[in-house]
């Protein structure tokens, strides 16, 4: 279980404050207007930002000040952060060992994830030789191979065409279900959110303004639907 209790980040002296509970294996979409604090929320969970106050626990362990490298979380951005001079295999391998000295079990795990992502025939290529969708598959594989209990997505597929984006969302959702991972995904699209998340959280003005069923948001019946430009 992921639990945030009054986690506070001071942005230009204006506090953003979040309280949220997400169960193990749950898939949750984080929606809201631009600048509302969605990415800030993910960065606080990942440890890239240190809160001024509040408590963040994962499976009842306090991780409020745990550095990102030691936090049981993986995060995928729109910018995939692949190393251009490393092969696909090496980029994925970094998720297992920063020194890329993989034992037989780790090699097997890496190739299994690559097969699951449909990139096992690309392992010797460099990122510059891949399409945008292929690069995101590699970045996702690097996240999944770490087998952390929580996966955070900050609009990683927004630059892809609609068909490819839907394919990647399905791949993420299925992979998280198989590994029993908790998924939190920032998105500007309620339609994308509805594909993988039955529950949504709406962020506005640095607060969680609403949380509930994604279908209710999409129908326009939720109090926060108007914040997303959805009319009932």
From Swiss-Prot:
Q: Which Pfam families match?
A: ABC_tran (PF00005)
What InterPro entries does the database record attribute to this sequence?
Answer: AAA+_ATPase, ABC_SmlMolc_Importer, ABC_transporter-like_ATP-bd, ABC_transporter-like_CS, P-loop_NTPase, Thiamine_ABC_ThiQ
Which segments constitute the ABC transporter domain?
A: 2-230
Parts forming coiled coils:
none
Localization of this protein: Cell inner membrane
> Which reaction(s) are listed as its catalytic activity?
thiamine(out) + ATP + H2O = thiamine(in) + ADP + phosphate + H(+)
What does the protein in this record do? Part of the ABC transporter complex ThiBPQ involved in thiamine import. Responsible for energy coupling to the transport system.
What quaternary structure, including any partners, is listed in this protein's UniProt entry? The complex is composed of two ATP-binding proteins (ThiQ), two transmembrane proteins (ThiP) and a solute-binding protein (ThiB).
What family is this?
Belongs to the ABC transporter superfamily. Thiamine importer (TC 3.A.1.19.1) family.
Designated name of the protein: Thiamine import ATP-binding protein ThiQ
Per the record, the gene is thiQ
